[in-house]
A protein has these predicted regions:
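Conserved active-site alpha-helix within GNAT-family acetyltransferase domains
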Residues: 156-182
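A conserved beta-turn-beta hairpin within the catalytic core of GNAT-like acetyltransferases
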Residues: 104-116, 179-180
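A short, internal acetyl-CoA/4′-phosphopantetheine-binding micro-motif in the GNAT/acyltransferase core
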Residues: 117-128
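Glycine-rich phosphate/pyrophosphate-binding loop shared by adenosine-nucleotide-utilizing enzymes
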Residues: 92-97, 114
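Conserved acetyl-CoA-binding loop-helix of GNAT-fold acetyltransferases
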Residues: 127-140
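Short amphipathic alpha-helix that is part of the acyltransferase structural core
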Residues: 20-68
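A conserved beta-strand-loop-helix scaffold within acyl/acetyltransferase catalytic domains
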Residues: 61-85, 90, 98-109
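Conserved GNAT acetyl-CoA-binding A-motif
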Residues: 144-156
């Protein structure tokens, strides 16, 4: 059930016994054009799984961390009100998503943060302004929820532009995001 510009409805999530099905199926009535809004994780997990696999394989930069979702934690974060899923649909079919975590700061308890985790739009929908529309909708909805600061880490090895930034980083910059530091990573091998 797609609920535009509102928080997810309380639900009693059930964890899938195995990985969700491998093919998407609409869970919302067919709608004209593209529709965006918050959806509860527990209601979109079956559709989300095949898109997560496409997203992961498209990035191809995570040999040290194979795709193996911690479904228990996803469901727990949903129950706690931390996990937010913003979806984009065309005629009821899931074509993109933003996954984020909304929490109060540990160093500033009155400051509400959103940490962007995943942003993906099916390649066949990337022409035009669909990605920009998705992110603008997310930012407006987060502001309406009282979020003060949105942070996003991007993978600059994915579709870099002439400056070395990813397409996502360039898109976020156009929406007013500013660099605040550098993310450094070291993979520790456990032989």
């Amino acid at each position: 059930m797609l609920v535009e510009n509102s928080e997810p409805e309380a639900s009693t999530p059930t964890q899938p016994e195995a990985a969700p099905p491998s093919s998407p199926r609409p869970s919302a009535p067919a709608r004209p054009d593209k529709v965006c809004g918050w959806e509860p994780f527990s209601l979109v997990v079956d559709e989300l799984w095949p898109l997560l696999k496409r997203h992961y394989h498209e990035l191809g930069a995570y040999e040290a961390a194979p795709l193996d979702p911690d479904w228990d934690r996803y469901f727990e974060y949903e129950r706690c009100g931390i996990l937010r899923i913003w979806t984009m649909r065309s005629e009821g079919v899931l074509i993109g998503y933003v996954v984020c975590q909304v929490v109060h700061g540990l160093h500033s308890r009155n400051t509400k943060y959103c940490f962007g985790d995943l942003f993906w739009l099916a390649p066949e929908w990337r022409d035009g302004l669909s990605g920009m529309r998705m992110l603008r909708g997310v930012l407006k909805a987060l502001k309406d929820m009282g979020v003060h600061i949105v942070r996003w880490e991007t993978n600059d090895t994915f579709e870099p532009d002439a400056t070395g930034r990813s397409r996502v980083a360039a898109l976020l910059s156009r929406l007013g995001f500013k660099p605040i530091g550098t993310v450094l990573q070291k993979v520790l091998t456990h032989e």
